Structure formats: C-alpha cells, structure tokens
Amino acid sequence: VRIVALWAFLALLTGCQQQNREELVLWHAYRGAEATALTSAVRRFEASADGVKVRLVSVPYDAFANKLSVAIPRGNGPDVFIYAHDRIGDWAARGLLEPLGLWANESLIDQFFLQTVESLVYEDALYGLPLAFKTLALFYDKTLVDVAPRTTAEMVAQAKAIRAADASRWGLAYPLDSLYFHAPWLHGFGGQVYSKGDEPALAAAPAVRSVAFTRRLVHEEKIIPEEVTSALVTSLFRDRKLAFVVNGPWFRGELEGHDKWAVAPLPIVSETGIPARPFLGVEGVLLSAQSLRKADGYALMRFLTRTDEAKTRLSSGGQLVANQAAYVKGAGDAFTEAFRQQVEQAVPLSNRPHMRRIWTPAQDALSQAIMHGVPPAEALQEAVRLIKRGD
C-alpha cells in the first residue's frame, strides 16, 4: 500500500512540476560519434515516452564537475547527467544525487558487469546506472610479437629478445609516474590504494614490491625507456619501435596508419599468480536530487542503459558499454573482446571524496623511486605522509 501511495505521490508531483519545467534536461560531455549516438538514443526515448521531451546540453568535460556542483543546489542544474563515477562520493555526501533504492532491483543490476555497478555505490546506496567503462589493457605490435604474453615473465622475455635483436626498439612503455598506469602492477602484487580501514595503503609491502618490479624493468631488464611521455609512446608504437603498450581504448584513435597491432588482457604477475588489475572508470547516468521529474528522469536512465540501446552505442558510438548482453560471444571484434575480458579483472576506481588527495603524492613517489633512485619504501612512505596530511 505504501509503495502504491508513493508512486501516486510521484505521479502527482511530476504532473504539478511539469508546469515549472516542460522538458527533462540531460547534461553530457560527449563529442563526435558518442554525442551522435546519444542524441539518436534520446530521440528514440522521446518517441516511446508519452509526451516526455528531453533537452540535451553539452558541457565541456573540464568545466562539467564545477558547473554541476554549483547548478544543482541553485535549482538550475540538469535532471539527469552523464559523468565519470569518481565524483559520486563527494556529490552524494553533499546531497546532490538521488539514490536509486526505490527503483533498482536485482534483475536490473544483473544486466551489468558487477564491477561497473560497484563503482556507482557509495555507503551502501546505488547512485546511478552504468553506461560505459574505460580501463587499461595490453596493446602489442604484431610484427614484433606473435602471441600476447600470458604472464609478466613471458612479457619480459619477449621484450628482452626484441631489444637484443634491435637496440633501437623497446619492449614496454607507459607513463611511469602515473598511479593510474601503475595500478595494474600494484593490484597484481596484492596491493591496494586504501586499506579496508580506509587508511592509505601505498607504503604496504605489496605496493613496495610493485614499484621495485617496475624499477627492475627500467634499470635492470632495460626494456622500458627511462623518460616516457604519452607522445613518445605513440611515436614509438606507430614507428614499430615498441612491442608492448599499457593503455586504454582511446589509444586506438592515435594509431592511424598502423594496422599491425592487437590488444589483449594484461598478463598475470608471475611473482604472485595474480592478474595485473587496472583501475576501472565508469560513465554513469545519474539523477539529480533536485530534479522535479524524478520518475521521468529514471525512465530515461533505464532506456539509455537497456540492451538494445547498449548494442547501438557499442556499434555506432564506439563505446565499451556496461550492459553484458550487448556483447555476443564470437560476434564482436577482437578489440572489444579484449576489453570485455579485462573489465572482469579491473578494480573500480575509488569514489571516496578524499581519493583526489592521492594522485599528486603518488606521482611524486613513483617518479622518485623509478627515475631518481630513491628506495621504493622511502618514497611511498613519504607519499602516505603527505596523503594523511591532506597535501
């Protein structure tokens, strides 16, 4: 009875508030094919909904978070918006997001990769539905590598053989001082960013071992250049001077003119038997707590994430979608399949509000330990000290 009454209240509330806003407002930061695919999906929603209209507003990604944080409390923000999950903790704590407990159920949740749903949970409440995901995988040059390595030992052996045959070529490259790119090894050695007690764990033994591993690849195995930039990685790989690259799906857009490459899940860390596990970033579709049309907003969210729409975004928008049923085994391309496999071994990037404190100290620690000879334990202990201090 209470549920029926609540739905009746929502319907009445929606009907009254439509006088104040005659259309749903959806904010996004998509461009190109992704924006086109979203627009088409929204028009299909309008055609299927009873008189519901949606106004799409494109907001530059760099300004999105700040603009949203100001607009929602003032009552002039969107009803629904699409954004990366890492700000959910901050926005939920400030009361900007509507939790989906009223609507979400097990059959709905089971549509998606579990890790993508976990990314949208903060303090046991679900705050959005997952649209798409991004993570890292292993790109390799097929003119240099016949078969993707299953373990890090195999990867190192292949890389060393390539270097021995031609010293102008390198085995592996990625931004060495980036925690985002180091995360596969951190997790593969059994480490984590925060402990279960919510304490920074970057100075724990597994984290120290992961940094020592990277330093060995640079200075002892000599398969990674000492100075690595994103531009250098792209240049070396396109010139076929690089065997392996740790990178995300966006890297494909930089490989025009190079068609002899492939991508595979990251290897198992030989020292631990644990797969290298990259961070997982999720683009969720979220509902504003200040929306005057929550029921209609949620209907739009459900529509955008359903299987047929996910298949369309996967094929025409080029997105790695979170809906599992959109992937037909054996029917997709190898690129998509590699990232579909990788998501199952990915670690959701923390959505804690204080996660943002960790990036700069971690970057400094990785730089000091890998490129400047500071002992890994010492560099990571300093990072933890700065994180706890709030620097």
Feature locations, PLM:
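Conserved N-terminal structural module of periplasmic/extracytoplasmic solute-binding proteins
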Residues: 3, 10-90, 270-273, 312, ...
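Short helix-initiation/N-cap motifs at beta->coil->alpha
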Residues: 58-67, 86, 152-154, 225-239
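Hinge/lid segment of periplasmic solute-binding proteins
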Residues: 83-137, 152-158, 184, 262-265, ...
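Short, solvent-exposed loop/beta-turn-alpha elements that line the ligand-binding surface or hinge
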Residues: 101-112, 191-210, 268-278, 328-329, ...
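Extracytoplasmic/periplasmic solute-binding protein
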Residues: 127-131, 136, 154-200, 206, ...
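Glycine-centered hinge/linker elements that transmit conformational signals in sensory
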Residues: 158-159, 198-227, 257, 266
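Extracytoplasmic/periplasmic substrate-recognition and gating elements
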Residues: 216-225, 256-319, 347, 364, ...
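Long, aromatic- and glycine/proline-rich binding clefts that accommodate carbohydrate-like moieties
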Residues: 264, 314-364, 368
